[in-house]
Amino acid sequence: MVPPTAVAEGSAVAIKDPVKDTILTPRFYTTDFEAMAAMDLQPNEAELEAICEEFRKDYNRHHFVRNEEFEGAADKLDPETRKVFIEFLEQSCTSEFSGFLLYKELSRRIKAKNPLLAECFAHMARDEARHAGFLNKSMSDFGMQLDLGFLTANKDYTFFKPKFIFYATYLSEKIGYWRYIAIYRHLEKNPDSKIFPIFNFFENWCQDENRHGDFFDALMKAQPDTVRGPIAKLWCRFFLLAVFATMYVRDVARKEFYEALGLDARTYDKMVIEKTNETSARVFPVVLDVNNDKFWTRLERLVANNAALDKADASDAIAPVKLLRKLPFWIGNGAEMAKLFLMPAIDSDRFQPAVR
């Protein structure tokens, strides 16, 4: 079901074609619902119940209400800023809507067997639907919206085992918190760089992301095998690296958006990665050594390879020639990711003992 707040309104709004799926675009996920329903929450049930009680309060129930500041705001943007801002809205809306679909389906499918877990997912689905609808409404200020019903039916869904859903969504929610709060604080100090009134909502908005991340933190502690043992350490390293590398490459590629806000994409991402890495030490057994200069050097090589891949894609060459041109950069990306993964990780007990 598409949330009512996210449905296009008015005949003057055009439906925007979704962007082509790439490794950098938001994914849609599904999982093993029976395994989720059968999960024993007893090892950390008290904390999960406390988090659910926080969700029930719905602190942002009345927060996402548009005001007169939105009127005519879209018309004030120059064409280039308008273009990169619409891209930001689309990516963000798709990501939030992806979360809504996953959480809503989980709440529906596990309700009979695991009511506490189902209720938590229902509350998070409510939040994600609200976010997606608010973003899509902002897109309508630019004369277009996403057809979220079409996305629901036509997007490819990636299957993840429950523990992989936990790792990926925990990081997505926590990184979302740090991204939103960093932009909000920057614009609070630099109001002339606030290109659109949606950024006024980011302070409360990011608290939804933070609470969702806390839920997955508590859920992993209720399933201790997800964060204990050598295999769990490897998976935590993998997901940290995958999420950080994807964000860094994507954001540097669209650095013009951050420049429009008066931010440097690399500096911004470095701060977000450092903060998310530090936060992750509260639940993950290991985190990445993001203070190692080699970490950033190798991310920059991924950026360069990705730019070369984009250039090859944009050329007029025939498909076989494009493939041959792209092959060295795919191999290069694989090699750099392997080097990043093999860098020594940091044990979380040593990294952040006070928090743990």
From Swiss-Prot:
One of its GO terms (biological process) is photosynthesis. Its cofactor is Fe cation. Keywords: Chlorophyll biosynthesis, Iron, Metal-binding, NADP, Oxidoreductase, Photosynthesis. The keyword Iron applies. Gene3D superfamilies: 1.20.1260.10. One of its GO terms (molecular function) is iron ion binding. The keyword Transmembrane does not apply. It holds the Pfam family Rubrerythrin. Pathway: Porphyrin-containing compound metabolism; chlorophyll biosynthesis (light-independent). It is an enzyme of class 1 (oxidoreductase). Its EC number is 1.14.13.81. It catalyses: Mg-protoporphyrin IX 13-monomethyl ester + 3 NADPH + 3 O2 + 2 H(+) = 3,8-divinyl protochlorophyllide a + 3 NADP(+) + 5 H2O. CDD domains: ACSF. Catalyzes the formation of the isocyclic ring in chlorophyll biosynthesis. Mediates the cyclase reaction, which results in the formation of divinylprotochlorophyllide (Pchlide) characteristic of all chlorophylls from magnesium-protoporphyrin IX 13-monomethyl ester (MgPMME). NCBIfam families: AcsF, PRK13654.1. HAMAP family: AcsF (MF_01840). Belongs to the AcsF family. This is Magnesium-protoporphyrin IX monomethyl ester [oxidative] cyclase. It comes from Synechococcus sp. (strain CC9605). The gene is acsF.
